[in-house]
């Protein structure tokens, strides 16, 4: 309906946000359009003060309720219009279609609050939640929980005219539940096929909403010891069917847990307490907004998901590498030893008897198998081979039949033997490979030469701050100051 005369505009005098929707719009649509001629009603307002209200949740097709929503924003500004489209119109329309909020700013007792802080998907409050902002603006997609809520309302509605969709639904492969040790990273992987051969896009989204009347997961209490609620944010769909928790870049830095995050934080953490983490593997056969070059049709896309449970136990963990925590040299043809803390993962409940060790030549792509199906006993000795040669290696230990993992913290250089520092000591025997020290002095006997040892006396205090760097004095006692 186009209003051609200003005098006929029923909204011209409704300058307050609380009067933009509700009865004026409902009355206008029912009189001018007719109740039987529309399924949902929504009015747009051009204003410098963005706002919105759905007037209901799940009211499509509902007489006297379905036409009460408004979205307001600066429609003349291309940047703000994008915000209007996603953060306001799609958000309020989502409410009309039956979706609740997914953010955790307060406990709304809906079971849909599966994203920490402000959330980042359409039904969250990204960008308007202060310290609780996960990011500045919402991403242009609905959380799988929102999709499920909307589909339930749409399916139950009485007014839609249903049309067949030629596009077949993707088929998700078998997924398994796992028990993992506390304070340990893990890796989620799923598979799916499409009967039509469509390009598939994937997400892993957590599906833990706080219990009614209990906590909310805000920046103040987001931590690895949460006993309920989400511990990981939603990430945009991509062609990758896997997700590391936390993200691999954090794992490589040894930052497995996160507390009190802000807008530039990852909002991802491992769990240090016993709990069940529910995850959904979400598969879509259409990209967001821009079609892929291989997509030749513009038909309706499908979204499907399947759930898994990751049980975190207090009886094991943390599973972690205990060797190669700092820069290390491995020499081709020489023996090397890797060690790790089994941390009762070989016992019930985790029951990991055998592990694989994977090596990354580039420090992050773990495609080379260093050892396969070896005992989970905390140690492995092998001979370095030429195909491992690299200046930036790392390794990952993970069970043969589980999803948790651990990565060493230091860079590994693999090379043939030589004498890098020219001090007359071959590198494989030199206790300070990069700095000349022909005397091989090692005061604390830790295998690291004094000239490159950050703690010469081995008392746990760095040389730079140790008030007696060559004599162990852990308490740093200094009676005369």
List the model feature ranges, each with a label.
Residues 1-282, 289-304:
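Extracellular (secreted or membrane-anchored) zinc-dependent metallopeptidases
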Residues 47-50, 100-102, 127-129, 209-210, ...:
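Acidic glycine-/aspartate-rich tracts in secreted/extracellular proteins
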Residues 121, 317-319, 365, 438, ...:
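Glycine-centered loop/turn positions within well-structured domains
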Residues 173-179, 322-329, 431-434, 467-470, ...:
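Short, solvent-exposed loop/edge segments of extracellular or virion-exposed proteins
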Residues 178-182, 186, 271, 324, ...:
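Hydrophobic beta-strand core residues of beta-sandwich domains
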Residues 196-199, 344, 350-352, 436, ...:
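Short proline/glycine-enriched turn/loop motifs at strand-loop junctions of beta-rich domains
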Residues 205-276, 282-417:
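Extended, solvent-exposed regions of the mature portions of secreted/cell-surface glycoproteins
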Residues 415-481:
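Extracellular calcium-associated, cysteine-rich motifs in secreted modular proteins
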């Amino acid at each position: 309906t186009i209003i051609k005369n200003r005098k006929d505009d029923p909204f011209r005098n409704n300058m307050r946000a609380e009067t933009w929707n509700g009865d004026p719009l409902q009355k206008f649509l029912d009189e001018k359009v007719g109740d039987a001629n529309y399924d949902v009603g929504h009015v747009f307002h051009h204003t410098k003060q963005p706002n919105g209200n759905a007037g209901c949740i799940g009211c499509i097709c509902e007489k006297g309720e379905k036409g009460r929503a408004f979205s307001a924003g600066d429609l003349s500004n291309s940047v703000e219009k994008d915000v209007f489209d996603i953060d306001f119109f799609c958000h309020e329309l989502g409410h009309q279609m039956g979706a609740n909020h997914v953010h955790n700013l307060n406990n709304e007792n809906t079971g849909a609050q599966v994203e920490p802080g402000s959330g980042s998907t359409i039904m969250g409050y990204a960008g308007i939640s202060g310290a609780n902002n996960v990011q500045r603006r919402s991403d242009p997609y609905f959380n799988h929980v929102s999709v499920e809520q909307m589909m339930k309302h749409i399916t139950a509605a009485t007014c839609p005219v249903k049309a067949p969709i030629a596009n077949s639904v993707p088929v998700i492969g078998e997924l398994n539940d796992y028990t993992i040790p506390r304070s340990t990273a893990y890796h989620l992987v799923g598979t799916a096929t499409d009967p039509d051969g469509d390009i598939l896009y994937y997400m892993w989204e957590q599906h833990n909403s706080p219990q009614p009347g209990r906590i909310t997961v805000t920046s103040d209490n987001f931590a690895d010891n949460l006993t309920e609620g989400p511990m990981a944010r939603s990430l945009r769909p991509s062609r990758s069917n896997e997700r590391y928790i936390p993200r691999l870049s954090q794992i490589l830095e040894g930052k497995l847990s996160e507390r009190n995050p802000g807008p530039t934080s990852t909002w991802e953490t491992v769990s240090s307490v016993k709990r069940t983490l529910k995850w959904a593997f979400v598969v879509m056969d259409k990209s967001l907004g821009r079609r892929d070059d291989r997509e030749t049709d513009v038909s309706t896309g499908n979204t499907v998901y399947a759930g898994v449970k990751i049980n975190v136990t207090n009886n094991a963990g943390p599973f972690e590498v205990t060797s190669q925590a700092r820069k290390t040299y491995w020499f081709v043809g020489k023996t090397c030893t890797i060690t790790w803390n089994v941390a009762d993962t070989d016992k019930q409940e985790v029951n990991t008897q055998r592990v694989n060790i994977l090596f990354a030549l580039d420090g992050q792509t773990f495609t080379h198998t260093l050892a396969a199906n070896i005992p989970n006993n905390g140690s492995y000795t092998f001979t370095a081979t030429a195909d491992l040669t690299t200046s930036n290696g790392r390794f990952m230990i993970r069970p043969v039949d589980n999803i948790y993992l651990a990565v060493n913290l230091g860079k590994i250089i693999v090379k043939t033997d030589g004498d890098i520092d020219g001090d007359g000591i071959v590198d494989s025997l030199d206790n300070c490979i990069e700095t000349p020290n022909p005397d091989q002095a090692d005061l604390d006997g830790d295998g690291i030469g004094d000239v490159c040892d950050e703690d010469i006396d081995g008392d746990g205090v760095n040389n730079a701050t140790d008030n007696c760097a060559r004599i162990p004095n852990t308490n740093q006692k200094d009676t005369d100051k």
